[in-house]
């Protein structure tokens, strides 16, 4: 997942990381729609019920390929949302929950991040952790709900839902591209008569019809 996210962000013009020799990392062109290909590949290569590890950063990435902000830019939060809502288990690396924007020393002891005062990154990840722990559709492995995709005309728009056996459903919307895009469905679309609460605002909203670059939403419906 992390390698695909890096490539999607680079395609969107978000990757600003430069190696110590000032050269940039070359990534293949990828878009949000390529997440489908990765998930299909994982379903073939790994046994059913496997806990896939989803992440936007880790110790190797942070030290040798740049922080998530250098690699993912304004897509950082949208991609973090996907690590929590796609099938699998999210990984948080040291300092990610505080928005730490520097490389940690790899072979030497480094200073830990400062957790106080709490900032909006702490609140952001606290909310996602709560959702992951409490929403039955987001359980990892075979206990979690299957994912239902809603294809759109834009390769950069990613929309899906996960519904548990009791009917509790989450809907996720994200624009991983470089431009504003219309959420125009090319197949089945989420039902329009659904009463859904925007997870981050707590308001009952209609699903978005356009998304700006890096924009993301989670809706919860019962």
Task: Pin down the residues of each PLM region.
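Active-site clefts of carbohydrate-active enzymes
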Residues: 47-71
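Active-site-proximal helices and loops of the catalytic beta/alpha 8
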Residues: 1-52, 82, 99-131, 136, ...
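Asparagine-centered strand-capping/turn motif at beta-strand->loop junctions
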Residues: 173-177
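Solvent-exposed beta-hairpin/edge-strand motifs
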Residues: 187-202
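Conserved short secondary-structure transition element at the edge of the structured enzyme core
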Residues: 81-98
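Beta-sheet entry/capping signal
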Residues: 51-53, 89-92, 168-171
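Short hydrophobic/aromatic beta-strand or adjacent loop that forms the aromatic wall/cage
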Residues: 155-157, 168, 213-218
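C-terminal beta-strand-rich structural cap/linker in extracellular carbohydrate-active enzymes
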Residues: 205-222
């Amino acid at each position: 997942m992390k390698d695909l996210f890096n490539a999607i962000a680079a395609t969107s013009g978000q990757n600003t990381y430069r190696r110590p020799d000032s050269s940039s990392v070359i990534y293949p062109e990828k878009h949000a729609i390529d997440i489908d290909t990765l998930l299909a590949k994982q379903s073939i290569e790994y046994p059913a019920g496997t806990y896939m590890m989803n992440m936007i950063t880790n110790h190797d990435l942070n030290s040798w390929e740049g922080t998530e902000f250098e690699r993912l830019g304004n897509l950082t939060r949208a991609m973090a949302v996907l690590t929590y809502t796609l099938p699998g288990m999210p990984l948080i690396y040291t300092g990610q929950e505080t928005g730490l924007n520097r490389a940690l020393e790899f072979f030497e002891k480094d200073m830990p991040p400062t957790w106080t005062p709490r900032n909006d990154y702490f609140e952001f990840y606290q909310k996602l952790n709560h959702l992951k722990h409490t929403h039955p559709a987001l359980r990892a492995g075979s206990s979690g709900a299957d994912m239902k995709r809603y294809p759109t005309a834009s390769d950069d728009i990613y929309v899906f839902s996960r519904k548990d056996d009791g009917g509790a459903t989450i809907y996720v919307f994200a624009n991983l591209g470089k431009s504003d895009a219309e959420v125009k469905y090319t197949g089945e679309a989420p039902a329009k008569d659904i009463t859904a609460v925007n997870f981050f605002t707590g308001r009952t909203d209609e699903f978005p019809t356009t998304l700006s670059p890096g924009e993301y939403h989670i809706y919860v419906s019962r």
